[in-house]
Amino acid sequence: MHCNTSETDTSESLIAPTAQQVLDWLPVRPARLLLWGGRTDGWVAMGVDIESAALCEDAAWAQHPHLARAGVLEARLPLEGPDWDVVVVHDLSPRVHSLTLWDQLAQRLRPGAVVVLTGVLPKNPRMPHWLDYVVALGQRCGFALLAPDGGDQATVPSPAFVRILRKAEIAPRWMLRHVRPQDAPSIAELFLEVFGHPISPALWEWKYGRGRGNAVTASRQGAVVAHYGGMYRDILLFGKPEWAFQICDVMVHPKERGVMTRQGPFLLTAAIGAEIYGPLGFGFPHPRAMEVAQKMGLYAPVGHMVEVRWQPSAPRARWATRLHLLSRTRNDDHALVDGVWRQMAADLVTEAVGLRDWAYLERRYLDHPHNHYELIAVVSRWTGRPLGILVLRRLEDCVELLDVVAPIQALPTLIDQARRLASLWGKSSVYCWITANQVHHFMVQGGVQTDVQVAIPTSVWTQDERAHVFKDKWWLMSGDTDFR
């Protein structure tokens, strides 16, 4: 099936170079030419074998559409075919995942082959310099830019574009790839090498499966040596639906860490991640990783995490409130969560906060393959009105409060019940992580604040002014991480 990748209705003749222009770019004849996303109508030439193939297939998502997030399709070369001398990519737009395009061209084209990119510049794309990033990605994958506009473009009206690149004779040191499901075992080997413990297939699926995340890898001599991953996070930014790319599983093989340069595998994968999945990003990096990323111009700090810890309180029942353990099998519980989430969202219309509806809580906590969390509603004993939700995890000696879903005014009551549960469970304390700009809401019930040396970055690689809107605006807790 052919998919419509353009966001603008244009005639194919407006954006395609002429057959004679393409023939002029052929390295040698006889030659093979692929019209990727175009038709062979009118393409007849001596000594040239011309084929056509769809650029992508309907619903073959490299980035699944969801709420505020637009879908991006995976480019797919024919499984069987020759090593083409020229590939003309028709109707290229942000609807096509550029790394899926270039990683296949890098593998399938012979040295000296030419790639011609054609299309119409989109109106108001998420990444304003989208086409520049597509070309830069091609260069990182081993292609040299021959002409920014394909020579004489007098016959091609603006905003149409043509970009011409040629594959280098020598392959780049690192092969860059969009991660696909079959790559999980090799990435797991890198994870073990870097972190010293394995990542299970189930945990990998929980993070990245079913369109929940994406990643970029760099390989050398067939082995994955770097990985830059992220999970999609639906957020409310000043009360409006948005999405951000939550960075996780940033890995570089120990033998490659000496190449921490602007052409090294870490920066290559991180830059591609920012250019494809930007401009809004965040994460919870280790201090050393944050320092390196700042020096390379990838990250800038927009906040940091702190810990608040409380002593247990009296275990007696509270006269005004009671507790209710939530269940995924009760629809009333789902509606309860969604209701208090709407109240919380209304209190945070001047902030940035990840969605905390039932669908999110179920996926984040109840679907986790290894950790056990308890989702507990605090309810008015007299009216039955839900006041908020606690997400708790019992540890060896304490209780972690990973998340709250509640209007701000209910936080003291929820924290009191969390302290009571710590006493009932025989734990010495209860604690939470919260962004420092929100900690004043938690300094109740005798809470004691300490720093945890975790900065919150924003992605500044693309120099997009939207990246700075998060400064001292995030509401993040330890449940927002992928590792707690």
Regions found by a protein language model. Name each.
Residues 11-31, 42:
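Conserved alpha-helix/loop element of class I SAM-dependent methyltransferases that forms part
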Residues 232, 279-327, 374, 382, ...:
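Active-site/acyl-donor-binding loops of N-acyltransferases
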Residues 141-143, 150-173:
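Core SAM-dependent methyltransferase catalytic element
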Residues 26, 183-229, 237, 276-277, ...:
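Amide-forming acyltransferase catalytic core, primarily the GNAT-like/NAT-type
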Residues 35, 39-76:
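Class I SAM-dependent methyltransferase SAM/SAH-binding core
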Residues 249-252, 257-275, 409-421:
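Conserved acetyl-CoA-binding loop-helix of GNAT-fold acetyltransferases
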Residues 99-114:
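A short glycine-rich, Lys/Arg-flanked "PGG" loop and its adjoining helix->strand segment in the class I
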Residues 76-87:
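A short acidic, Gly/Pro-enriched loop at the edge of an enzyme's catalytic core
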